Regions:
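Membrane-integral, polyisoprenol-dependent glycosyltransferases
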Residues: 1-208
Length: 208
């Protein structure tokens, strides 16, 4: 069982990396949204304003800064902002979300089920496209999915302590795309707990 699990895990890791990472810089920005996000990271690096940078002389970003921080981090390593470094946060998020899904289901079902789930995630058209784009959606989705996995683990263990890792993921999602990063994972977990006949007000208290 362990050998099969380890082989499947390495297969998913290698497959996810090979499918995503080498191809990020092969095409120019092809939507108005991609350069709009990249220029925010460029402005952060150029002017040192990491909270509310001013773009093109007067425009301010209308999305929270976490995604742009990620672009700026990778671009700082590379030396400049380009298509590859701008798309890398999305690709890394998809790789980590795929691996996280595999590990989550392997512990609760079996290796075969988790392998199928991971491959379906990685090859789903919209998910793959989001992972190849310089947009906030993939980073936001990966953090929310991670939060839901961690909230489920917290429920499994009896809800004794605060789910700090889930809170950290939801904080990152909120810093990526706003309050939906908290609202959606808590709503999904709240509905799940209701299906398990948990006390309604107890759920509200724990999710608040």
């Amino acid at each position: 069982m362990n050998i099969k699990y380890n082989k499947a895990l390495w297969l998913i890791i290698i497959l996810a990396i090979v499918m995503m990472i080498p191809f990020l810089g092969l095409s120019d920005f092809n939507t108005k949204g991609e350069p709009r996000e990249a220029v925010v990271a460029y402005t952060m690096l150029e002017h040192g304003n990491w909270i509310l940078p001013i773009n093109n002389g007067g425009d301010i970003p209308y999305k929270p800064p976490f995604f742009h921080w990620c672009i700026a981090f990778f671009s700082l390593i590379a030396g400049h902002v380009n298509e590859y470094t701008s798309r890398l946060p999305s690709a890394v998020s998809l790789v980590l979300m795929t691996i996280g899904g595999f590990v989550f289901y392997a512990k609760r079902k079996n290796t075969q089920t988790s392998l199928i789930a991971a491959i379906l995630t990685l090859t789903a058209f919209e998910v793959h496209r989001a992972g190849m784009n310089c947009r906030v959606d993939m980073v936001n989705s990966a953090l929310m999915v991670g939060a839901m996995y961690l909230l489920y683990r917290w429920w499994e263990k009896g809800k004794h302590q605060l789910p700090w890792l889930a809170i950290l993921c939801m904080s990152g999602a909120t810093l990526t795309k706003g309050p939906v990063g908290i609202i959606l994972p808590c709503f999904v977990m709240g509905v799940f707990m209701l299906t398990q006949r948990e006390n309604f007000w107890g759920i509200v208290w724990r999710m608040a």
